Structures are given as structure tokens and as C-alpha cells.
């Protein structure tokens, strides 16, 4: 078949479910596998933002597993979220930048243009672009402070309106939330 289905997800597990309200990650995983096993190609679209970083390894591990099981059938694209600024990865701190560098290394070590069960160089280049953008374009000064305050306000308001709990979904970012709140 010549069909291709594009599916959007920005992280994995409870974090992906918090980001995309109404998402059931287990159902998403089953649906991707069902499409692939039926011969339908899938393109995973990640709008890469700050909240993608903590559990992104789990997402790319899933993608790699599916690439190995269904060669030629799955691609991943990682365009960067630039707006709203308070959710962009440009508000990250040094710890998250280091984590992002580790993620790039993981993708690099699992990239080959001769092994169809790995990431390809185009996918790697797009992800390296995310890291380079974060490293060279991070917000500073008042812009950083304002966007981090807006980040906290967004989290609090999102949880209030949707009856969700960001703190449960993102325990590894609790320190960052507290930093931003000061």
C-alpha cells in the first residue's frame, strides 16, 4: 500500500498523556503497531518542546523497536516548537541541555543509512538541529525569567482547568518548576 499515516506525540507514557490531553499512550502504541503490521507506513511527528525532554528516550526507544520489527515502515520527525515561548525548549536549564545531548548521542549511536532498522541520517540531522537550536538560542535575562514564570502559570492553569496533575506526570522536573516559580 502507498498509504502513510502521520501521528503526533511529543513524549511517552503519562507525560505524553499530560501534554496531549485525552491521549491514551497504550492505545496509541497498539494503534501504531496495528497500522505497521497491516502494511501502512507511519510518520511520527514530534513537536519538540521542553516537556518532550524528560521521557523522550522512551519514545525513541519505542520508535527504534518498531523500526526493527517493521523495516522501512516508520519515520520520526522532530520539528521544534517555537510558540508559545513558555513551552519551547529554549527555557531549558543546563541539566536538561545535558539530557538532550545524551539523547542526541543515543540517536547517533543508533543511526545508519545502510541498516533499515535504525534511524536514518535525515532523522538524526533533524534531531541534532533541535539540540543545536537549544544550545545556541536559549533564552536569557528578562526573556528567560518572563517565559519561565509563564511556564509555571500555564502548568498551574492547565492542571486547574483539566483536573490533571503535572507534578505527578513530570516528577523529574519538579526542581525546575520550583526554580521557575522563584
Predicted segments with their positions:
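Radical SAM/AdoMet-radical enzyme domain recognition
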Residues: 1-83
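Sequence-level detector for tyrosine residue identity
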Residues: 6, 12, 70, 105-106, ...
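Charged, low-complexity, helix-prone segments enriched in Lys/Glu/Asp/Gln
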Residues: 6-8, 45, 96-107, 182
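Helix N-terminus capping/helix-initiation residues
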Residues: 24, 88, 92-93, 155, ...
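Context-gated lysine
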Residues: 34, 41, 65-69, 85, ...
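Flexible glycine/acidic-rich beta-alpha junction loops that bind and position SAM and/or redox cofactors
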Residues: 48-54, 70-103, 113, 117-133
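Radical SAM enzyme core and accessory elements
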Residues: 108-182
Amino acid at each position: 500500500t502507498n498509504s502513510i499515516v502521520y501521528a503526533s506525540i511529543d513524549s511517552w507514557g503519562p507525560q505524553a498523556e499530560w501534554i496531549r490531553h485525552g491521549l491514551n499512550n497504550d492505545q496509541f502504541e497498539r494503534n501504531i503497531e496495528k497500522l505497521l503490521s497491516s502494511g501502512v507506513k507511519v510518520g511520527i511527528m514530534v513537536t519538540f518542546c521542553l516537556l518532550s525532554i524528560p521521557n523522550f528516550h522512551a519514545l525513541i526507544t519505542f520508535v527504534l523497536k518498531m523500526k526493527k520489527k517493521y523495516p522501512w515502515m516508520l519515520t520520526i520527525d522532530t520539528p521544534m516548537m517555537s510558540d508559545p515561548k513558555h513551552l519551547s525548549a529554549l527555557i531549558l536549564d543546563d541539566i536538561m541541555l545535558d539530557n538532550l545531548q545524551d539523547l542526541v548521542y543515543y540517536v547517533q549511536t543508533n543511526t545508519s543509512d545502510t541498516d533499515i532498522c535504525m534511524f536514518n541520517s535525515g532523522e538524526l540531522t533533524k534531531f541534532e538541529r533541535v539540540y543545536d537550536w537549544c544550545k545556541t538560542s536559549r533564552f536569557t535575562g528578562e526573556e528567560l525569567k518572563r517565559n519561565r514564570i509563564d511556564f509555571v502559570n500555564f502548568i498551574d492553569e492547565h492542571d486547574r482547568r483539566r483536573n490533571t496533575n503535572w507534578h505527578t506526570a513530570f516528577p523529574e522536573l519538579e526542581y525546575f518548576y520550583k526554580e521557575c516559580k522563584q
